[in-house]
Structure formats: structure tokens, C-alpha cells
Regions:
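Short, small/polar-rich loop/turn modules that mediate ligand/substrate recognition or access, typified
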Residues: 2-4, 59-61
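Short, flexible catalytic-loop segment of classical short-chain dehydrogenase/reductase
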Residues: 9-20
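Catalytic "switch" loops of ABC-type ATPases
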Residues: 14, 54-55
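A short C-terminal helix-loop "cap" of Rossmann-like NAD(P)-dependent dehydrogenase/epimerase domains
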Residues: 19-33
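A conserved structural motif in NAD(P)-dependent oxidoreductases
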Residues: 33-44, 55
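Short C-terminal tail/terminal secondary-structure segment
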Residues: 60-81
Length: 81
């Protein structure tokens, strides 16, 4: 059947709920992301569109981290209190 199954591992993404984070908490969380910011919804959408496109026709069984380098930098439990 040639079904491809992939997953997106998203980082914190700018949404109305996330936009309510301000001050030191937000700054501390953003500092833990190597790119220094939260993702934009369009960046997540682009990754999803890629995985569903013919450009990704030979990709299956993959979990794509769209996280600004967070996983490469390493999980920091102290960020979450």
C-alpha cells in the first residue's frame, strides 16, 4: 500500500496561549532553545507540508523534531521548575 507514517515533534510554538507567557519565565524558556525563540505556526506547517509532499516520498517511520535545536542542546528539567 506504500503508506508513509511520520511524526512531527514540535517545539514551543507561538500561539495565543503561549503569547500570554511574559517576563522571566518566557525568557528562561527561550534561552534553552539554541535558536533563542519559540517557533512560528508557519514553521510547523511548512514541516508538515514537507512530510506530506513528494519531496519526502522516501521518508517513512521518522519523527521530525522541529524544535530550534532543543533536543540537540539537551533537556533541562530546571526550565520547568
Amino acid at each position: 500500500h506504500r503508506v508513509r507514517v511520520n511524526a512531527l515533534l514540535p517545539a514551543q510554538t507561538e500561539t495565543p496561549m503561549i503569547a500570554e507567557q511574559v517576563g522571566e519565565e518566557r525568557q528562561r524558556r527561550e534561552e534553552r532553545i539554541p535558536l533563542g525563540r519559540y517557533a512560528q505556526p508557519s514553521e510547523m506547517a511548512s514541516a508538515i507540508a514537507f512530510l506530506g509532499s513528494d519531496d519526502a516520498s522516501f521518508i517513512t517511520g521518522h519523527a521530525l523534531a522541529v524544535d530550534g535545536g532543543y533536543l540537540a542542546f539537551g533537556f533541562r528539567p530546571s526550565v520547568y521548575g
